[in-house]
Design a protein with these regions (language model features):
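Terminal accessory carbohydrate-recognition/targeting modules of carbohydrate-active enzymes
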Residues: 1, 6-265, 269, 295, ...
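Catalytic cores of carbohydrate-active enzymes
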Residues: 271, 389, 393-399, 440-522, ...
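Inter-helical turn/loop segments and adjacent helix faces that build the functional surface
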Residues: 250, 364-376, 445-461, 515, ...
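Glycine-rich phosphate/pyrophosphate-binding loop
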Residues: 196-230, 415-432, 540-557
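Glycine-rich, acidic and aromatic/proline-enriched surface loops and short helix-turn segments
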Residues: 275-283, 326-334, 597-604
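Non-catalytic C-terminal accessory modules of carbohydrate-active enzymes
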Residues: 76-103, 110-112, 390, 522-532, ...
Length: 644
């Protein structure tokens, strides 16, 4: 299978950039490289939220080093980076195969020993299970497991200190330990009787090259309480469990097998993305969120509404859409009333957020029916549109010309949100092109929806508003070259060629006629299209910077100045199919190949946040990004409708 990688494992330049991510619905995850060498401070075998400490994830178990012992000779399978490009103990040399079509599985060969290691992250609790199978051996074999503990937030590092507790208690077939107050106890158990040797030790100066690349601190010390030793026979499987509650060792085998049976294989582009889509769901008590990405993003309002249709409707999970919308609806209602949001959705006050919520509900209406959308969400849609028309939004001013004006001079208010020294890198302000495209689309969609529901008065009023808005949109944004200005504020017109003009070609309702739409599509195709997404700025525009590398400030300047983003390509493909219909299908399918190629690089089976805008278009940023996965899923679904 394409998910099986053999020859690249020995070469760390090939294997270290490839990461795997497994999550559960509570926000906990397991993330590392395919050779099990942690290269980010976010990496770990068991990383979990600790709500009584803060709103961050915490690395409890950083890694587990295995040693194969035969005839008194020890072969250590672990891998860590230390100072001066020094890797130790170089366990990757023994890897013969890595496969993650079903679950991440690594096969090691040490002399006559063949050992298979398979990892699974349990769906309904914070627990990782690792199954070791001795496929072949010619003499008595012992396994030794050495756990590296961190007990720290993903944003910080730990260093050798005297506060760390060295205490541990024996539990069935294992131990439990907790390094600091406020943390849950970590239970490490095997399904077979074993010896635990207490040998407390700090491993100093472990380095994370990805953090170094990004200009951050990059070294720490990890605590090893000792090691487990267990004999293993040819054909036998032993399971190691790490979790925050005790488990009966007798249950480990069946738990592992039940979890494996529950997984969708990553055997196609669609299945990879569908698996990835499930990873962004985050349930906390009654609330259901969508995380913007892994490993560092929380739930951001815009990202949630943009990605919701692709992550749920496009994989036929309408109930999941409704669950997330229930949480979002509470937040929207509180926001409209001027009360605290009351849940963990961030950036609710950005001016385009409510309009993206309308767009998400519009996709729901297309996937279910307008009647169902009206019955469930009609009042919410009317409240949103009324709130904006009554000029009650803090940063959306409805002008006489029907356009929405937003102030972004001092604060980044759109998805192009990078700031340096507190100032927006791109001060998009005034009439912003996608906000007004969203506005026109929302007016027309809600007008049609309420007219069908019998409210002709409101429908007429919204249509009249849309007429004014549409006319002004064309007058204000369209320039003599046939493309759209990115934003207009008084005499300030931004002529940069940016992807924000594509939305109005993609949306169901647009103020542009077909000729105007095609002109926009043409310039986007010529100047912004790459195999990995749309560039955020044309190479012909001033300030083009396609490489998202270096320390934070350098990256912030490049973030939306030429880097390519896959989610924009979703809207681009929708626009392309809107213009070319059936005859556009083969082009769109070819255009997806560049993203399908990503399934075996970066975060295996997912799409990273962004790419460099020039060849070789390297993946950058967060390893798995919700809007990207969602929009490509939405396009795959759209293509399947054309291909019926």
């Amino acid at each position: 299978s394409e998910m099986c990688i053999r020859d690249r494992m020995i070469n760390l330049e090939e294997s270290l950039p490839r990461e795997i991510l497994r999550t559960n619905k509570s926000g906990a995850y397991h993330c590392t490289t395919i050779v099990d060498c942690n290269t980010r401070k976010y990496h770990g075998l068991l990383v979990i939220p600790v709500p009584n400490l803060d709103d961050e994830n915490h690395v409890l178990l950083s890694s587990l080093d295995e040693t194969v012992i035969q005839h008194g000779a020890e072969f250590n399978l672990g891998l860590h980076k230390y100072q001066g490009n020094h890797f130790s103990p170089n366990g990757h040399k023994y890897i013969r195969e890595f496969d993650c079509e079903h679950i991440p599985a690594t096969t090691y060969r040490v002399g006559g020993v063949i050992l298979r290691k398979e990892k699974i992250f349990v769906h309904h609790e914070n627990r990782i299970l690792i199954r070791y199978t001795l496929v072949d051996a010619h003499s008595a074999t012992t396994l030794r497991f050495r756990p590296f503990l961190a007990f720290r937030s993903v944003r910080e590092y730990t260093h050798e200190n005297s506060q760390a507790s060295r205490d541990y208690q024996l539990v069935e077939n294992g131990i439990k330990t907790c390094m600091y107050p406020g943390y849950p106890e970590l239970f490490m158990q095997l399904n077979k009787k074993n010896e635990f040797h207490y040998e407390p030790n700090w491993y100093r100066g472990i380095e994370y090259p990805k953090e170094q690349e990004r200009g951050y601190d990059f070294n720490e010390d990890l605590y090893v309480p000792g090691y487990f030793e267990v004999d293993i026979k040819k054909g036998e499987s032993i399971i190691f469990s790490a979790g925050i509650s005790e488990i009966s060792p007798r249950r480990l085998k069946q738990t592992f097998e039940a979890e494996v049976a529950d997984r969708t294989p990553r055997d196609s582009f669609y299945h990879c993305l569908k698996n990835s889509a499930h990873q962004f769901h985050n349930k906390q008590e009654e609330d259901h969120y969508i995380l913007a990405g892994y490993p560092w993003f929380k739930c951001r309002a815009r990202d949630m509404f943009v990605s919701l249709p692709g992550l749920t409707l496009a994989v036929d999970e309408i109930g999941e859409f409704e669950d997330v919308m229930e949480t979002a609806r509470k937040a929207i209602n509180n926001y409209i009333k001027g009360e605290p949001i009351g849940c963990k959705i961030y950036e609710m006050d950005d001016p385009d957020v409510l309009l993206w919520a309308v767009w998400a509900l519009q996709q729901y209406a297309k996937e279910t029916s307008r009647e169902q959308c009206r019955a469930k969400y009609g009042s919410l849609l009317e409240e949103i549109i009324d709130f904006i028309r009554q000029r009650k939004h803090d940063n959306l001013f409805l002008h006489e010309n029907g356009l929405l004006y937003a102030n972004g001079a001092d604060r980044a208010i759109t998805w192009m949100n990078s700031t340096v020294n507190g100032r927006p890198v791109i001060p998009r302000t005034g009439y912003i092109v996608e906000i007004n495209a969203l506005w026109y689309n929302a007016l027309r969609f809600i007008a049609d929806l309420v007219r069908e529901g019998g409210n002709g008065l409101l429908a007429d009023s919204l249509d009249a508003q849309a007429e004014v808005t549409g006319k002004s949109f064309v007058e204000v944004f369209r320039n003599e070259y046939g493309y759209l200005l990115d934003y207009v504020d008084g005499n300030m017109m931004d002529w940069s060629v940016r992807p924000n003009m594509i939305f109005t070609v993609a949306f169901d309702y647009s103020p542009l006629d077909r000729v105007q739409k095609k002109q926009v599509l043409d310039i986007v195709t010529k100047e912004l299209l790459t195999p990995k997404g749309l560039r955020t700025l044309s190479p012909k525009s001033g300030g083009y910077n396609p490489n998202y590398v270096g320390p934070q400030i350098q990256r912030d300047y490049a973030y939306h100045q030429g880097t390519a983003w896959p989610w924009l390509m979703g809207f681009y493909m929708e626009a392309y199919l809107r213009i070319y219909k059936m005859s556009g299908i083969s082009f769109v399918e070819r255009q997806l190949i560049g993203l399908e190629d990503e399934m075996t690089s970066h975060c295996v089976g997912s799409l990273p946040e962004l790419f460099d805008g020039n060849p070789p278009f390297k993946g950058r940023g967060a390893v798995s990004f919700a809007m990207n996965v969602a929009e490509i899923l939405r396009i795959l679904k759209l293509l399947s409708k054309y291909n019926l």
